């Protein structure tokens, strides 16, 4: 299995984050703590000025600023008010996963045979059993297929069976709208799923359209290729200089992706991540193709199906994922929703032997409570922040951020947070184009959050006087976006 490229990329995530943290953002802990300023009046006035501005009028906000070393609240505005946190929910998901599952946690994917093998023929089913690995890629399935061939199997009479029973069968959280379902951020959650590349957007396929000759349809491809998805190509190549109007969307309730619009000659075309309905079947189908490439043949009746693996099935091959220590980087830097929901179900499975949202969210609430944080004002419907019904007060998120500093896994959590103004997406993540002034660039580590009319930012900021503050800013009911206003507040904190 070729892991060198993956490991280099993961190492870049870690090394880059460490360098930024070491050279720009040095956390203040223990003996490094500097004396807190006696007065935060200037900061208070500055934040209040933003809150009362015309842009923020009518916005529901909850804001808390704490000293990172003492936990003393130095500013608060409706701190106990529950506000839709968007992806700031991931602060709870990430810290809980590190606490419950641990940094060394990995996902395992197995291939097992049920039935006798005689003269290279498996007279039975071949099972692909998953436990939620969001990093599983086509190349991993190719390696597993190679190991099946090396075990002596040359032909299979039964089905290629997807075993996704590690999780329940509920694929989408309640906060997902029908209009969201085609988009990568609303991928279906399954214990057996596949990512098209190293961004690890599990449950999606990359659809690419490239121009051909003028007047002809564009060339449309899927990565990875799968027979589960049907592509309807309604594109047309148009002369150079014409606008690119190509759209790509999966029809609701189907695995049909409609690609339509005009694509100019000599243009780069368009590439988009589109979700797949039934990720288990998608993964098993790509695995079946990998088996065929290894020269393994099938009977005329062999198909992709779904079932639980029998207890007496023979293990043929295993693939373990990268550890949570590594996964935290793409999860938090890129705010990956599928990772959040998979981790929630994994926590439910680990603690209550139930891979469901109910069990996973229960674990999250209980873990927060164990740190002495009240659940008052907290309501969770998912672990990614997609639901507008999620509610968390800023004081709770800031408490979680404070308690995280006391944990042995804190360096991993800290490295996973986007770094303000750092252009490399593997470092800056969702903050790479924000807070770019010298006052704050590289000095803010924070989780972003954004939904329609909802913006949030929670994390750590190094001030001008070398003090570290914890902050949580949650806003909803914004007419357009509160991001500029949130950034102004953080700059006010940094100037302290």
Mark where each language-model region is.
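Small-residue-rich helix-loop
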Residues: 74-76, 137, 344-496
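Sec-dependent N-terminal signal peptides of Gram-positive bacterial secreted proteins and lipoproteins
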Residues: 1-35
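Beta-lactamase-like hydrolase cores
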Residues: 25-69, 75-81, 142-151
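A short glycine/serine-rich beta->alpha loop
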Residues: 78-83, 273, 386-387
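Loop/turn elements at helix/coil->beta-strand transitions in domains of secreted/extracellular proteins
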Residues: 59, 156, 339, 376, ...
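Solvent-exposed, polar/charged alpha-helical surfaces in well-ordered, non-transmembrane soluble domains
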Residues: 41, 45-49, 92-99, 139-142, ...
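Active-site SXXK
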Residues: 71, 85-103, 160, 192, ...
